Amino acid sequence: MALKPIELNFLGQVVRLNAPEEQHNDLRDAAKELDKRVSEMKDRMQTVQVERAVHVVALNLCFELLLEKQKTKSTEQILQNQIQQLSHSLENIAARSTNQQPAYEIQ
């Protein structure tokens, strides 16, 4: 994964960084989303202080990330329980089928 330079414009600044080329579009989208959120927050807070809006947006993004991690963990636990139940059911079916004698024999 070769790193290639990318130039991003957001929050009134140009940021140059190196990232894998396949991530460039996602980084551009992230920069646009950040710009949008900060702009909306400035409007809601009725402030021109970009730094203050950035702090609130950063806190909101971290909170959203935390919620998504919790959802993922919960979903993983539910799936793990379902896998265990399915495995147990399959073991029971296999045990029953090996203990049963066939009703008839083909000769």
UniProtKB/Swiss-Prot annotation:
Transmembrane segments: none annotated. Keywords: Cell cycle, Cell division, Coiled coil, Cytoplasm, Septation. The keyword Cell cycle applies. Residues 21-99 form a coiled coil. Its main location: cytoplasm. Pfam families: ZapA. One of its GO terms (biological process) is septin ring assembly. It is found in: Cytoplasm. GO terms for cellular component: cell division site; cell septum; cytosol. The keyword Cell cycle applies. Homodimer. Interacts with FtsZ. Belongs to the ZapA family. Type 1 subfamily. Activator of cell division through the inhibition of FtsZ GTPase activity, therefore promoting FtsZ assembly into bundles of protofilaments necessary for the formation of the division Z ring. It is recruited early at mid-cell but it is not essential for cell division. This is Cell division protein ZapA. It comes from Actinobacillus succinogenes (strain ATCC 55618 / DSM 22257 / CCUG 43843 / 130Z).
